[in-house]
């Protein structure tokens, strides 16, 4: 498990949520979309790390 990657992904998720809310409040669809994209990227990173963890368990 790469703790550093998970921390980065969590930070990106928080950043994305904030950006999405700012886009919603200001009526800026670009910010809202970018925020959602960052959240999706965060999920991909977390899923990748989960798969790596499971593969390591299976090999050991």
Swiss-Prot record:
It comes from the Bacteria. SUPFAM superfamilies: Hypothetical protein YjbJ. Pfam families: CsbD (PF05532). Belongs to the UPF0337 (CsbD) family. This is UPF0337 protein asr4653. The lineage of its organism: Bacteria, Bacillati, Cyanobacteriota, Cyanophyceae, Nostocales.
